[in-house]
Amino acid sequence: MTVRFGLLGAGRIGKVHAKAVSGNADARLVAVADAFPAAAEAIAGAYGCEVRTIDAIEAAADIDAVVICTPTDTHADLIERFARAGKAIFCEKPIDLDAERVRACLKVVSDTKAKLMVGFNRRFDPHFMAVRKAIDDGRIGEVEMVTITSRDPSAPPVDYIKRSGGIFRDMTIHDFDMARFLLGEEPVSVTATAAVLIDKAIGDAGDYDSVSVILQTASGKQAIISNSRRATYGYDQRIEVHGSKGAVAAENQRPVSIEIATGDGYTRPPLHDFFMTRYTEAYANEIESFIAAIEKGAEIAPSGNDGLAALALADAAVRSVAEKRQISIA
């Protein structure tokens, strides 16, 4: 069976998913929709699909699944529409910026028995998957501490930041999901600090560009997250998990893995410039997992509930900064 896809949204992340879907032998990109015709036409030209409206994709008999890459404030409504239309749904994070709206959306998904996967792509990165396998295989014993470093090469435009929900809901939310994925227990408390160290305009927009978070589970396990909107040396993505018998780490990746030694010292190529190249394999693996859930009934993960759990941690981090205290998770 070939899963026939409709793509909603032809922006930066839409292009990433168009490539992942088109590169899968069990998938076919049938149609793309975007508010900007030129963006949709560019993807249609690159991958041989049609340009249609969202309404047409919703009603189409030749579409089995959709990938939602539209602005965040449209996600929940589109999920509900396509759940009722009987389509399988892959939605980029977050489902919504409001937890109650997410819960209402997930009820529709449950009532319609729709398949919904949320786009936390880092779970599917081969290096991070190997970290999880080392944990599952007992190589490092019982997990005690997770340390996640995630730093963007530069800040997004302020106009984007104003509608993003803030750094915790836009950027750190990936790390909240990864912390849950690796800890093996749900965090029960969140302590966060935040500052504006890079661009005053970000602060004027009501957000931060430099944050740190400590998550703790009921048994005392901890996850420490470091985020920055500036890394002059490239896209900084590292994870270390410390356990009772050892530790496992995934270091930064480079487009070319060479090292040059001369009398002046050692040099290595720069890091990947951003997520589009750093996580190419992750996006492909993510779509592969979604297709397996559609075709074979495999478990869907990350699920809508995973999206809600990550948002709850982001909301708690926002409160922690505002109230300057540790926040308990109900």
Curated annotation (Swiss-Prot):
Induction: By myo-inositol. InterPro entries: Gfo/Idh/MocA-like_OxRdtase_N, GFO_IDH_MocA-like_dom, Myo_inos_IolG, NAD(P)-bd_dom_sf. Transmembrane segments: none annotated. GO terms for molecular function: inositol 2-dehydrogenase (NAD+) activity; nucleotide binding. Belongs to the Gfo/Idh/MocA family. It is an enzyme of class 1 (oxidoreductase). It catalyses: myo-inositol + NAD(+) = scyllo-inosose + NADH + H(+). NCBIfam families: myo_inos_iolG (TIGR04380). Keywords: NAD, Oxidoreductase, Plasmid. PANTHER family: BINDING ROSSMANN FOLD OXIDOREDUCTASE, PUTATIVE (AFU_ORTHOLOGUE AFUA_2G10240)-RELATED, NAD(P)-BINDING ROSSMANN-FOLD SUPERFAMILY PROTEIN-RELATED. Pathway: Polyol metabolism; myo-inositol degradation into acetyl-CoA; acetyl-CoA from myo-inositol: step 1/7. This is Inositol 2-dehydrogenase. The lineage of its organism: Bacteria, Pseudomonadati, Pseudomonadota, Alphaproteobacteria, Hyphomicrobiales. One of its GO terms (biological process) is NADPH regeneration. Involved in the oxidation of myo-inositol (MI) to 2-keto-myo-inositol (2KMI or 2-inosose). The keyword Kinase does not apply. GO terms for cellular component: cytoplasm. Its EC number is 1.1.1.18.
